[in-house]
Amino acid sequence: MDQNNSLPPYAQGLASPQGAMTPGIPIFSPMMPYGTGLTPQPIQNTNSLSILEEQQRQQQQQQQQQQQQQQQQQQQQQQQQQQQQQQQQQQQQQQAVAAAAVQQSTSQQATQGTSGQAPQLFHSQTLTTAPLPGTTPLYPSPMTPMTPITPATPASESSGIVPQLQNIVSTVNLGCKLDLKTIALRARNAEYNPKRFAAVIMRIREPRTTALIFSSGKMVCTGAKSEEQSRLAARKYARVVQKLGFPAKFLDFKIQNMVGSCDVKFPIRLEGLVLTHQQFSSYEPELFPGLIYRMIKPRIVLLIFVSGKVVLTGAKVRAEIYEAFENIYPILKGFRKTT
Protein backbone atom coordinates (compact mmCIF):
# COMPACT_ATOMS: atom_id res chain seq x y z
CA MET A 1 0.00 0.00 0.00
CA ASP A 2 1.24 3.46 -0.84
CA GLN A 3 2.26 5.60 2.11
CA ASN A 4 0.25 8.58 0.89
CA ASN A 5 -2.84 6.46 0.51
CA SER A 6 -2.60 5.31 4.14
CA LEU A 7 -2.95 8.89 5.37
CA PRO A 8 -6.25 10.64 5.71
CA PRO A 9 -7.33 12.82 2.85
CA TYR A 10 -6.77 16.12 4.72
CA ALA A 11 -3.16 15.07 5.54
CA GLN A 12 -2.14 13.73 2.18
CA GLY A 13 -1.23 17.10 0.76
CA LEU A 14 0.82 18.02 3.84
CA ALA A 15 2.84 14.84 3.83
CA SER A 16 3.63 15.05 0.12
CA PRO A 17 6.89 16.68 -0.96
CA GLN A 18 4.92 19.21 -2.92
CA GLY A 19 3.01 20.22 0.18
CA ALA A 20 6.11 20.91 2.24
CA MET A 21 7.03 24.51 1.53
CA THR A 22 9.96 24.81 3.91
CA PRO A 23 11.74 21.77 5.24
CA GLY A 24 12.06 21.52 9.00
CA ILE A 25 9.27 24.02 9.81
CA PRO A 26 5.87 22.47 10.35
CA ILE A 27 3.00 24.15 8.65
CA PHE A 28 0.43 23.07 11.22
CA SER A 29 0.65 21.49 14.64
CA PRO A 30 -2.29 20.90 16.95
CA MET A 31 0.00 21.67 20.01
CA MET A 32 1.23 24.97 18.58
CA PRO A 33 0.05 27.93 20.70
CA TYR A 34 -2.34 30.47 19.30
CA GLY A 35 -0.68 33.23 17.37
CA THR A 36 2.49 31.36 16.34
CA GLY A 37 3.31 30.17 12.87
CA LEU A 38 3.76 31.87 9.59
CA THR A 39 0.57 33.90 9.56
CA PRO A 40 0.94 37.02 11.85
CA GLN A 41 -1.93 37.51 14.30
CA PRO A 42 -3.25 40.97 15.31
CA ILE A 43 -2.24 42.14 18.85
CA GLN A 44 -5.27 42.55 21.11
CA ASN A 45 -5.01 45.90 23.17
CA THR A 46 -6.66 46.12 26.68
CA ASN A 47 -8.82 49.09 27.57
CA SER A 48 -6.25 50.71 29.91
CA LEU A 49 -7.73 54.17 29.42
CA SER A 50 -11.17 53.06 30.57
CA ILE A 51 -9.68 51.52 33.74
CA LEU A 52 -7.87 54.76 34.61
CA GLU A 53 -11.04 56.74 34.07
CA GLU A 54 -12.97 54.45 36.39
CA GLN A 55 -10.29 54.81 39.08
CA GLN A 56 -10.38 58.58 38.76
CA ARG A 57 -14.15 58.56 39.02
CA GLN A 58 -13.99 56.42 42.15
CA GLN A 59 -11.43 58.74 43.71
CA GLN A 60 -13.58 61.75 42.90
CA GLN A 61 -16.61 60.06 44.45
CA GLN A 62 -14.62 59.25 47.59
CA GLN A 63 -13.41 62.83 47.85
CA GLN A 64 -16.95 64.12 47.44
CA GLN A 65 -18.16 61.76 50.16
CA GLN A 66 -15.39 62.89 52.49
CA GLN A 67 -16.22 66.54 51.84
CA GLN A 68 -19.88 65.87 52.57
CA GLN A 69 -18.97 64.12 55.82
CA GLN A 70 -16.75 67.03 56.85
CA GLN A 71 -19.53 69.50 56.09
CA GLN A 72 -21.96 67.44 58.17
CA GLN A 73 -19.50 67.34 61.07
CA GLN A 74 -18.99 71.09 60.87
CA GLN A 75 -22.74 71.64 60.90
CA GLN A 76 -23.09 69.38 63.93
CA GLN A 77 -20.32 71.25 65.74
CA GLN A 78 -21.96 74.58 64.97
CA GLN A 79 -25.28 73.28 66.29
CA GLN A 80 -23.60 72.06 69.47
CA GLN A 81 -21.90 75.42 69.96
CA GLN A 82 -25.20 77.21 69.49
CA GLN A 83 -26.84 74.93 72.04
CA GLN A 84 -24.03 75.54 74.52
CA GLN A 85 -24.34 79.30 74.05
CA GLN A 86 -28.07 79.10 74.63
CA GLN A 87 -27.53 77.07 77.79
CA GLN A 88 -24.96 79.56 79.06
CA GLN A 89 -27.33 82.44 78.40
CA GLN A 90 -30.08 80.63 80.28
CA GLN A 91 -27.75 79.97 83.21
CA GLN A 92 -26.69 83.61 83.30
CA GLN A 93 -30.31 84.71 83.28
CA GLN A 94 -31.11 82.31 86.11
CA GLN A 95 -28.13 83.55 88.12
CA ALA A 96 -29.17 87.15 87.58
CA VAL A 97 -32.70 86.35 88.68
CA ALA A 98 -31.43 84.53 91.76
CA ALA A 99 -29.09 87.41 92.66
CA ALA A 100 -31.93 89.90 92.35
CA ALA A 101 -34.06 87.71 94.58
CA VAL A 102 -31.31 87.46 97.17
CA GLN A 103 -30.98 91.24 97.25
CA GLN A 104 -34.72 91.56 97.61
CA SER A 105 -34.84 89.05 100.45
CA THR A 106 -31.94 90.69 102.29
CA SER A 107 -33.57 94.11 101.98
CA GLN A 108 -36.80 92.64 103.37
CA GLN A 109 -34.91 91.10 106.27
CA ALA A 110 -33.18 94.41 106.96
CA THR A 111 -36.51 96.26 107.06
CA GLN A 112 -37.96 93.61 109.35
CA GLY A 113 -34.94 93.87 111.65
CA THR A 114 -35.35 97.65 111.93
CA SER A 115 -39.06 97.29 112.69
CA GLY A 116 -38.34 94.93 115.61
CA GLN A 117 -39.67 91.76 113.95
CA ALA A 118 -37.75 88.49 113.89
CA PRO A 119 -36.17 87.77 110.49
CA GLN A 120 -37.65 84.93 108.43
CA LEU A 121 -35.57 82.16 106.91
CA PHE A 122 -36.20 81.22 103.31
CA HIS A 123 -35.66 77.95 101.52
CA SER A 124 -32.63 78.02 99.22
CA GLN A 125 -34.63 76.76 96.23
CA THR A 126 -37.25 79.49 96.58
CA LEU A 127 -34.86 82.42 96.17
CA THR A 128 -36.23 83.58 92.82
CA THR A 129 -38.21 86.57 91.67
CA ALA A 130 -41.97 86.40 91.52
CA PRO A 131 -43.47 85.65 88.08
CA LEU A 132 -44.57 88.61 86.01
CA PRO A 133 -48.27 89.11 85.22
CA GLY A 134 -49.37 86.93 82.34
CA THR A 135 -46.49 84.46 82.72
CA THR A 136 -46.44 80.99 84.22
CA PRO A 137 -44.80 80.63 87.65
CA LEU A 138 -41.41 78.97 87.88
CA TYR A 139 -42.49 76.65 90.69
CA PRO A 140 -45.78 74.77 90.95
CA SER A 141 -48.09 75.26 93.87
CA PRO A 142 -48.12 74.93 96.84
CA MET A 143 -44.39 75.90 96.81
CA THR A 144 -44.36 79.46 95.53
CA PRO A 145 -41.32 81.73 95.23
CA MET A 146 -40.26 83.47 98.43
CA THR A 147 -42.33 81.08 100.55
CA PRO A 148 -40.87 81.24 104.07
CA ILE A 149 -39.81 77.91 105.55
CA THR A 150 -40.12 77.63 109.32
CA PRO A 151 -36.94 76.01 110.65
CA ALA A 152 -36.92 73.39 113.35
CA THR A 153 -35.76 76.04 115.84
CA PRO A 154 -37.27 79.56 115.73
CA ALA A 155 -34.83 82.24 114.66
CA SER A 156 -35.67 84.35 117.71
CA GLU A 157 -34.35 81.66 120.06
CA SER A 158 -30.86 82.51 121.28
CA SER A 159 -28.18 79.85 120.92
CA GLY A 160 -26.40 80.80 124.13
CA ILE A 161 -23.06 80.22 122.37
CA VAL A 162 -20.59 83.05 121.80
CA PRO A 163 -17.97 82.53 119.05
CA GLN A 164 -14.41 83.18 120.15
CA LEU A 165 -12.09 85.32 118.03
CA GLN A 166 -9.06 83.36 116.86
CA ASN A 167 -7.29 85.72 114.48
CA ILE A 168 -7.48 89.34 113.36
CA VAL A 169 -5.77 90.70 110.25
CA SER A 170 -5.14 94.44 110.11
CA THR A 171 -3.24 96.80 107.83
CA VAL A 172 -1.45 100.11 108.43
CA ASN A 173 0.56 102.54 106.33
CA LEU A 174 3.90 103.70 107.75
CA GLY A 175 4.03 106.57 105.26
CA CYS A 176 7.63 106.15 104.04
CA LYS A 177 9.83 103.95 101.88
CA LEU A 178 11.74 101.24 103.73
CA ASP A 179 15.05 99.45 103.21
CA LEU A 180 14.12 95.87 103.98
CA LYS A 181 17.72 94.63 104.10
CA THR A 182 18.58 97.15 106.81
CA ILE A 183 15.51 96.19 108.83
CA ALA A 184 16.28 92.47 108.55
CA LEU A 185 19.92 92.96 109.63
CA ARG A 186 19.34 95.34 112.54
CA ALA A 187 15.99 94.23 113.96
CA ARG A 188 15.39 91.26 116.24
CA ASN A 189 13.18 88.31 115.28
CA ALA A 190 13.12 89.44 111.65
CA GLU A 191 13.74 87.41 108.52
CA TYR A 192 13.95 88.46 104.89
CA ASN A 193 14.28 86.20 101.85
CA PRO A 194 13.39 88.17 98.71
CA LYS A 195 13.50 85.03 96.57
CA ARG A 196 10.62 83.54 98.54
CA PHE A 197 8.61 86.59 99.66
CA ALA A 198 9.16 90.30 99.05
CA ALA A 199 8.60 91.41 102.64
CA VAL A 200 10.28 91.30 106.03
CA ILE A 201 8.62 88.86 108.45
CA MET A 202 8.85 90.18 111.99
CA ARG A 203 7.46 88.68 115.21
CA ILE A 204 6.90 89.91 118.76
CA ARG A 205 5.88 87.99 121.87
CA GLU A 206 3.42 90.41 123.49
CA PRO A 207 0.94 90.36 121.96
CA ARG A 208 2.00 87.23 120.06
CA THR A 209 1.64 88.43 116.48
CA THR A 210 3.42 88.44 113.13
CA ALA A 211 3.95 91.41 110.82
CA LEU A 212 4.68 91.56 107.10
CA ILE A 213 6.58 94.76 106.32
CA PHE A 214 6.86 95.83 102.67
CA SER A 215 9.29 98.26 101.07
CA SER A 216 6.42 100.59 100.10
CA GLY A 217 5.71 101.27 103.78
CA LYS A 218 2.60 99.08 103.99
CA MET A 219 2.39 96.61 106.86
CA VAL A 220 0.08 93.67 107.61
CA CYS A 221 -0.38 92.47 111.18
CA THR A 222 -1.82 89.00 111.91
CA GLY A 223 -2.34 86.74 114.90
CA ALA A 224 -4.07 89.08 117.37
CA LYS A 225 -7.04 87.83 119.39
CA SER A 226 -8.83 91.17 119.72
CA GLU A 227 -9.07 94.56 118.06
CA GLU A 228 -7.08 96.23 120.84
CA GLN A 229 -4.28 93.68 120.61
CA SER A 230 -4.07 94.13 116.83
CA ARG A 231 -3.75 97.92 117.14
CA LEU A 232 -1.19 97.63 119.96
CA ALA A 233 0.93 95.15 118.00
CA ALA A 234 0.86 97.34 114.89
CA ARG A 235 2.06 100.33 116.95
CA LYS A 236 4.92 98.27 118.39
CA TYR A 237 6.06 97.24 114.92
CA ALA A 238 5.92 100.85 113.75
CA ARG A 239 8.01 101.89 116.79
CA VAL A 240 10.66 99.27 115.92
CA VAL A 241 10.92 100.67 112.41
CA GLN A 242 11.22 104.21 113.83
CA LYS A 243 14.11 103.18 116.08
CA LEU A 244 15.97 101.89 113.03
CA GLY A 245 16.08 105.44 111.63
CA PHE A 246 13.07 105.51 109.29
CA PRO A 247 10.47 108.34 109.56
CA ALA A 248 7.63 105.88 110.10
CA LYS A 249 4.13 107.09 110.96
CA PHE A 250 0.92 105.28 111.91
CA LEU A 251 -1.66 105.98 109.18
CA ASP A 252 -4.89 104.35 108.02
CA PHE A 253 -5.09 101.52 110.53
CA LYS A 254 -7.91 99.18 109.47
CA ILE A 255 -9.08 95.70 110.38
CA GLN A 256 -9.42 93.66 107.20
CA ASN A 257 -10.56 90.25 108.47
CA MET A 258 -11.71 88.59 111.66
CA VAL A 259 -11.86 84.84 112.27
CA GLY A 260 -13.98 83.24 114.96
CA SER A 261 -14.87 79.70 115.95
CA CYS A 262 -17.31 77.86 118.18
CA ASP A 263 -18.82 74.43 118.86
CA VAL A 264 -22.55 73.67 118.74
CA LYS A 265 -22.00 70.45 120.78
CA PHE A 266 -23.90 68.12 118.42
CA PRO A 267 -23.08 66.35 115.11
CA ILE A 268 -24.51 67.78 111.88
CA ARG A 269 -25.84 66.09 108.73
CA LEU A 270 -23.83 67.97 106.14
CA GLU A 271 -25.34 66.01 103.20
CA GLY A 272 -28.85 67.19 104.03
CA LEU A 273 -27.66 70.74 104.63
CA VAL A 274 -25.96 71.04 101.25
CA LEU A 275 -29.02 69.63 99.46
CA THR A 276 -31.36 72.10 101.15
CA HIS A 277 -29.09 75.14 100.76
CA GLN A 278 -27.48 74.43 97.41
CA GLN A 279 -27.31 78.09 96.43
CA PHE A 280 -25.20 79.10 99.43
CA SER A 281 -23.17 76.00 100.28
CA SER A 282 -20.69 73.59 98.72
CA TYR A 283 -19.52 70.28 100.16
CA GLU A 284 -16.74 68.16 98.64
CA PRO A 285 -15.61 65.69 101.33
CA GLU A 286 -12.89 64.30 99.04
CA LEU A 287 -11.25 67.73 98.84
CA PHE A 288 -12.13 69.31 102.21
CA PRO A 289 -13.96 67.75 105.18
CA GLY A 290 -16.01 70.84 105.95
CA LEU A 291 -19.06 72.38 104.33
CA ILE A 292 -18.48 75.89 102.99
CA TYR A 293 -21.51 78.12 103.59
CA ARG A 294 -21.46 81.63 102.07
CA MET A 295 -23.93 83.83 103.90
CA ILE A 296 -25.31 86.87 102.06
CA LYS A 297 -26.11 89.13 105.00
CA PRO A 298 -23.84 89.57 106.78
CA ARG A 299 -21.29 88.62 104.13
CA ILE A 300 -19.57 85.88 106.10
CA VAL A 301 -18.08 82.54 105.06
CA LEU A 302 -18.69 79.66 107.47
CA LEU A 303 -16.83 76.34 107.59
CA ILE A 304 -19.16 73.76 109.13
CA PHE A 305 -17.81 70.36 110.18
CA VAL A 306 -19.72 67.17 110.92
CA SER A 307 -18.46 67.22 114.52
CA GLY A 308 -20.32 70.46 115.20
CA LYS A 309 -17.32 72.79 115.01
CA VAL A 310 -17.96 76.03 113.10
CA VAL A 311 -15.40 78.54 111.81
CA LEU A 312 -16.55 82.03 110.74
CA THR A 313 -14.36 84.30 108.62
CA GLY A 314 -14.62 87.42 106.49
CA ALA A 315 -15.98 89.82 109.11
CA LYS A 316 -14.86 93.42 109.49
CA VAL A 317 -16.36 93.89 112.96
CA ARG A 318 -17.06 91.55 115.83
CA ALA A 319 -20.84 91.97 115.60
CA GLU A 320 -20.93 90.41 112.12
CA ILE A 321 -19.53 87.13 113.48
CA TYR A 322 -22.11 87.03 116.26
CA GLU A 323 -24.95 87.85 113.86
CA ALA A 324 -23.86 85.21 111.34
CA PHE A 325 -23.72 82.50 113.99
CA GLU A 326 -27.16 83.41 115.34
CA ASN A 327 -28.51 83.11 111.79
CA ILE A 328 -26.91 79.73 111.09
CA TYR A 329 -27.56 78.09 114.47
CA PRO A 330 -31.30 77.35 113.89
CA ILE A 331 -30.45 75.80 110.52
CA LEU A 332 -27.75 73.62 112.05
CA LYS A 333 -30.12 72.49 114.78
CA GLY A 334 -32.61 71.47 112.09
CA PHE A 335 -29.97 69.15 110.60
CA ARG A 336 -28.84 67.66 113.88
CA LYS A 337 -27.65 64.08 113.45
CA THR A 338 -29.56 61.63 115.63
CA THR A 339 -27.56 58.71 116.99
UniProtKB/Swiss-Prot annotation:
- GO molecular-function term, one example from the UniProt record: RNA polymerase II general transcription initiation factor binding
State the disease link.
Spinocerebellar ataxia 17: Spinocerebellar ataxia is a clinically and genetically heterogeneous group of cerebellar disorders. Patients show progressive incoordination of gait and often poor coordination of hands, speech and eye movements, due to degeneration of the cerebellum with variable involvement of the brainstem and spinal cord. SCA17 is an autosomal dominant cerebellar ataxia (ADCA) characterized by widespread cerebral and cerebellar atrophy, dementia and extrapyramidal signs. The molecular defect in SCA17 is the expansion of a CAG repeat in the coding region of TBP.
Q: What is this protein called?
A: TATA-box-binding protein
| Record PROSITE patterns | TFIID
- Gene3D superfamilies recorded: TATA-Binding Protein (3.30.310.10)
Organism in which the protein naturally occurs? Homo sapiens (Human)
On whether Nucleus is a keyword of this UniProt record, the answer is yes
The superkingdom of the source organism is Eukaryota
What does the entry state regarding organ or tissue expression? Widely expressed, with levels highest in the testis and ovary.
Q: Which family does it belong to?
A: Belongs to the TBP family.
The record describes the protein's role as: The TFIID basal transcription factor complex plays a major role in the initiation of RNA polymerase II (Pol II)-dependent transcription. TFIID recognizes and binds promoters with or without a TATA box via its subunit TBP, a TATA-box-binding protein, and promotes assembly of the pre-initiation complex (PIC). The TFIID complex consists of TBP and TBP-associated factors (TAFs), including TAF1, TAF2, TAF3, TAF4, TAF5, TAF6, TAF7, TAF8, TAF9, TAF10, TAF11, TAF12 and TAF13. The TFIID complex structure can be divided into 3 modules TFIID-A, TFIID-B, and TFIID-C.
